[in-house]
Amino acid sequence: MASPSRQPPPGGSGLLQGSRARSYGSLVQSACSPVRERRLEHQLEPGDTLAGLALKYGVTMEQIKRANRLYTNDSIFLKKTLYIPILTEPRDLFNGLDSEEEKDGEEKVHPSNSEVWPHSTERKKQETGAGRANGEVLPTPGQETPTPIHDLSASDFLKKLDSQISLSKKAAAQKLKKGENGVPGEDAGLHLSSPWMQQRAVLGPVPLTRTSRTRTLRDQEDEIFKL
């Protein structure tokens, strides 16, 4: 017969005294760890897979395997339920102690309507008073400002363009007429205003004077042509 296994004496020294021995790398959740997990129990159905459960709950397949101590994908059907680890934020662990501080911060950032409303009404009164002093008419909140109409049809645009072209043609023709009528008079006034031109008009054309130099130059040209 097999001998019964020995049990350690109560109160003895060793690894099993007061706590369970764990190997290196075991999944131990530390009390000081800021990341905590909340496990959700899922009833397995015939069409469930690890990938589908991971997508459904927003976790990874490795986390589901680690939480249920699974080593293959086919072993999930050996169990009726699976534990899905869901991470919880660290501030949820304070049991609402920091909720009052958050509310106070929100009240400081977002003031109440009773504090904002008087400032807005005073600003509107100042703007209306300045507009009346300058003679400007400010629109009331219920009244919309009339928007100027700038949209023209194609026919109106072409008519406007034709009228502008005709006006520019008339102005150019008038300028040409004024130039043709005014140039001869101006030239005559310029010619008569100068004393040299007046003297030339009275005496007539000035005859060319023949000097000895001109004669010698002409004789040299004749000799060149003869050669």
Swiss-Prot record:
Sorted alphabetically, which InterPro entries does this protein's record hold? Answer: LYSM1-4, LysM_dom, LysM_dom_sf
Check the record and name the Pfam families matching this protein. LysM
Name one cellular component (GO) term. Answer: nucleoplasm
Keywords linked to the UniProt accession: Phosphoprotein
SMART domains given in the database record: LysM
Where is the region Disordered? Answer: 1-22, 97-150
- Compositional bias (Pro residues) at which positions? 1-11
Q: Please, which domain of life does this record's source organism belong to? A: Eukaryota
Give the modified residues of type Phosphoserine: S23, S33, S99, S166, S194, S212
| Record-annotated LysM domain positions | 40-84
List, alphabetically, the PANTHER family matched: AND PUTATIVE PEPTIDOGLYCAN-BINDING DOMAIN-CONTAINING PROTEIN 1-RELATED (PTHR20932:SF2), LYSM AND PUTATIVE PEPTIDOGLYCAN-BINDING DOMAIN-CONTAINING PROTEIN (PTHR20932)
Q: What is this protein called?
A: LysM and putative peptidoglycan-binding domain-containing protein 1
Q: Say which species the protein is native to.
A: Homo sapiens (Human)
Q: Print the organism lineage.
A: Eukaryota, Metazoa, Chordata, Craniata, Vertebrata
